[in-house]
Amino acid sequence: KFICPDGVDWDVFLDALNNLGVRYTKEKPCFQIDVYFDTPQYILLNSGAAVRIRQSGEAYIGAYKVSQNQQGAIFERREFEWKLSDNETKLWNDEKKPTIPPTIIDKLNLHEQTLRKVLAVETHRHIAVVNGNDGFKAELSLDEVTFRGHKGQAHYREIEVELLNGRLEQLKQLADSLQNHLKLQPAVDSKYKKGLILVGKYGITPPMH
């Protein structure tokens, strides 16, 4: 993941891919809203985890993410997703109550603390899918983000390179090429952490790991 510089828009990004000789197909841009939850003591944040409900089109999808390894701009994470049923979606829209499967709750180790909404993230996402040799496949996205939290709102732009299939080494090569070509700075924080730093309650500065 990289911080997207002001001078780089989607056209500039695609030009860079063309100049690098990368084969890609453009996907339809999308808009999504993520709502993140944590305990009053920010147990999830402090353990490198995140729980969110995402609205994308008509679908509502929950996710639990936990960091495993990070080297510069490369994040390795485990991710568990679940789709909200019609009834669960209604409960979410009417009462803002998230439905989280018991198996996920067990993993969270909340120590009987309750989860509450701590951050909303609105993302306009442009997407290109790269198909390389040996079955290598990666999703590239340029995100125009608005964070909404206790301290108001803040804007942020990010470039993400996600491995869909193939070797991590191939992903690193692609990420390095883009970083050098566009002079990108690594994004060292997850979106959740970045949002809390910018607009979180009391200007919380999450502990550095």
Task: Label the model's feature ranges.
Residues 1-209:
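Phosphate-end processing signature that detects enzymes handling 5′-triphosphorylated RNA
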